[in-house]
């Protein structure tokens, strides 16, 4: 029997709705990965509602929880770590400590960093110390980096002038350590307004993917978290990076179609679960170069 992968997901959690782990854990489980959720915050709901209740996990608790898993002899079974929203740079350093601990007992373990800073339509949402930490420390340890356009701009200190400029910016991040950069949401002058575009960049090649842009009265939250989680899950299940990229785009589109059909502000993950596991649509990633 083929072994089921195990993944430690360290990011935010909401009681109501879908953001952070609340957007990523169930879909990753649904495609066949055992997920160990470690919630960096627990809020009543995501912050785009304008009000919420809850608390942030103290940074020192992250390595304590990792050591608790080690104490029962299970840490070596962790195949990957996913990190998302950070409340502080101290919390980020605690996560990197956990990643290092896991890689020490399982050198093959992967680390995907979703460098959450904000959304292009909503602005930056983290303190400057978090942005600095992500660029100066997290990127170097990440096997996979999954920024959106705002985060790519922040890393590179400028906005792109074209699709090929986005490609060059993403490639520049490879020099800092990651084996692959997945840009979850491209935005550049001349981009077609009816398309949603993504980019996958590795040392061996680069691929561009375009899918239809679906209209919503209010953009659902958690799409980036869903994207990063599914991409890492599919890699753990044996997909090539390109195949994982294509699968992720299709599965996320299926969720958005169901969400749109239900006129819902929150992602309709449960209703779309079969199509997450078995997308009906397919979007081809096209090789791209200078």
Swiss-Prot record:
Write down the chemical reaction(s) this protein catalyses. pyridoxal + ATP = pyridoxal 5'-phosphate + ADP + H(+)
Tell me, what's a Pfam family for it? Answer: Phos_pyr_kin
Its pathway, per UniProt, is: Cofactor metabolism; pyridoxal 5'-phosphate salvage; pyridoxal 5'-phosphate from pyridoxal: step 1/1
Keyword flag Signal: no
The entry marks the following residues as binding ATP, namely 114, 151, 184, 211-214
Quaternary organization: Homodimer.
List the PANTHER family.
PYRIDOXAL KINASE
Q: Which family does it belong to?
A: Belongs to the pyridoxine kinase family. PdxY subfamily.
Instruction: Please identify the protein, giving its name as recorded.
Output: Pyridoxal kinase PdxY
